[in-house]
Design a protein with these regions (language model features):
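Gly/Ser/Thr/Ala-enriched C-terminal appendages of enzymes
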Residues: 55, 78-101, 106-168
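Buried, small/hydrophobic-residue-enriched core segments of structured protein domains
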Residues: 2-86, 90-91, 116, 121, ...
């Protein structure tokens, strides 16, 4: 996007939060990762990933400022119906109309899964869907389910690698 002067689009990678946890400590990882994301991307790429250190932990850091600032959330693991209710509750508690926020559902979705979630959401928020594996591999063979995650990093160019963790 920078090279071609395009508006960047996308969401946080888990590794962003994982790095912040290793560097700054896991108790403050979500809050610092959100703050630094805002500093780096200046309001672009406004869909927040919620599950690096569990969704409940994420929501404890996703205060009113971030809930208003970010365009929405990305569901990437767990039960989409439970997540939807948590997101709706969180926005309402912050006095934000959930219909003004986007949730990107993106965990191993197929067309039937999208229809089921869409029916459940029923216009209570703006729902969009990331169908990767099953859209590009809808030919009747079982897709590979492969996730690659960071397992260590060198904070600020240090000499030693530090372990990182992801909890969903």
């Amino acid at each position: 996007a920078m090279k071609y002067n395009l508006t960047p689009m996308g969401t946080h990678p888990h590794e962003w939060f994982m790095y912040h946890g290793a560097h700054y400590g896991y108790r403050s990882a979500n809050a610092l990762a959100l703050a630094n994301w805002v500093d780096v991307y200046d309001g672009h790429l406004g869909i927040a990933l919620t599950d690096t250190y569990t969704t409940d932990n994420f929501f404890s850091s996703f205060d009113t400022q971030y809930a208003k600032l970010f365009d929405g959330l990305r569901w990437d693991s767990g039960d989409p119906y439970v997540f939807t209710e948590k997101a709706l509750k969180h926005y309402r508690e912050k006095r934000i109309d959930p219909r003004t926020k986007t949730v990107v559902y993106s965990d191993a979705l197929d067309l039937e899964g999208v229809e089921n979630i869409r029916s459940f959401v029923n216009g209570r928020l703006h729902d969009v869907y990331g169908i990767g594996t099953f859209l590009s591999n809808d030919v009747g063979v079982k897709p590979l389910n492969m996730v690659i995650k960071m397992f260590e990093c060198k904070p600020q160019g240090g000499k030693e690698f530090w372990p990182v963790v992801k909890l969903s």
